């Protein structure tokens, strides 16, 4: 990891304004209390600062609290290819789950803050709270669908159409 956790959250997930995006609906109060223990640290990033780099071992997934991050690949010829933008309430770092290390770089586009969700602790808790595991599956499914739409747009749309589709997607997420 290229960051050092900067603070311990004073507010809990259950009272965070972004909880509607991160927390599953229908949790019992005891489940909410357990989920509140997942986020023990946050990291504050300045514009251009990396959250993680391609090849870093998977340790956490991250929830964007404020700001915007991009994920990108470095191509063999040294060019950078942006593969995603991550807005408040969205999760990033999922690309590290399959191989055990991140497949992209995550970089702050502006001053940003993310909640650090240790993946191992999340997995343990998800086994205890099935609705949390279901929520995670939905998040991963949305990511796959978004990636498929992106691939479709690259293969079938003109540049103007791709730009319009990107702006529409971005406005729907805001």
Predicted features and spans:
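Residue-level recognition of specific faces of alpha-helices
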Residues: 15, 60-63, 82, 105, ...
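Cyclic nucleotide-binding regulatory domains
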Residues: 49-111
């Amino acid at each position: 990891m290229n960051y050092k956790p900067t603070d311990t959250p004073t507010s809990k997930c259950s009272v965070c304004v972004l909880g509607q995006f991160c927390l599953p609906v229908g949790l019992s109060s005891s489940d909410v209390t357990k989920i509140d223990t997942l986020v023990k640290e946050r990291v504050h990033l300045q514009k251009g600062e990396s959250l993680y780099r391609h090849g870093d071992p998977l340790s956490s997934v991250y929830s964007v609290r404020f700001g915007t991050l991009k994920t990108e690949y470095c191509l063999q010829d040294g060019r950078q290819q942006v593969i995603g933008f991550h807005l408040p309430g969205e999760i990033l770092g999922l690309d590290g789950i399959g191989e055990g290390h991140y497949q992209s770089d995550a970089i702050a586009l502006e001053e940003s803050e993310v909640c650090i969700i240790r993946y191992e602790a999340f997995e343990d808790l998800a086994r205890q709270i099935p609705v949390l595991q279901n929520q995670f599956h939905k998040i991963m499914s949305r990511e796959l669908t978004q990636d498929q739409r992106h691939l479709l747009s690259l293969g079938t749309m003109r540049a103007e159409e791709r730009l319009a589709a990107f702006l529409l997607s971005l406005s729907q997420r805001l």
